[in-house]
């Protein structure tokens, strides 16, 4: 179909008109940085300062996407959500509760399923693109 025949907007499942202006382009987003650190009792090594640029939150509140930056350190993680990750920069090691480890480097793409428990260790300052889905009891 020629571009001239494509409708400029469509209706979403919620009946809201969605158009090209609804697209969230991370490179153009002007999202405020959220700075934080894990709770002290969860930190095992270093001072893992972290910054999130949460560029998108779904209207239902179950999905978000953005960019995460982490400084060297190791802390406990307990995922209640499903998270797709793409490492854009740096090196991290993800370990499960049994001590099994996976080294994560720039270019790696993976999903951490809800229920995963273990540690995240940043060896070299890390940048991660993420998409998070938090299921409810009905989804």
What are these regions (language model features)?
Residues 95-97, 121:
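A generic structural motif
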Residues 2-62:
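A short, N-terminal "cap"/entry segment at the start of jelly-roll beta-barrel domains
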């Amino acid at each position: 179909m020629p571009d001239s025949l494509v409708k400029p907007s469509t209706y979403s499942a919620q009946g809201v008109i969605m158009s090209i202006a609804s697209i969230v382009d991370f490179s153009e987003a002007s999202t405020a940085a959220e700075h934080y650190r894990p709770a002290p009792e969860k930190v095992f090594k270093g001072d893992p300062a972290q910054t999130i640029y949460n560029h998108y939150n779904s209207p239902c509140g179950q999905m978000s996407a953005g960019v995460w930056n982490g400084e060297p350190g190791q802390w406990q993680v307990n995922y209640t959500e499903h998270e797709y990750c793409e490492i854009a920069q740096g090196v991290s090691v993800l370990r499960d509760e049994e001590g099994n480890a996976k080294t994560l480097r720039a270019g790696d793409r993976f999903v951490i399923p809800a229920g995963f428990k273990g540690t995240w260790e940043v060896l070299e300052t890390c940048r991660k693109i993420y998409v998070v889905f938090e299921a409810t009891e009905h989804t």
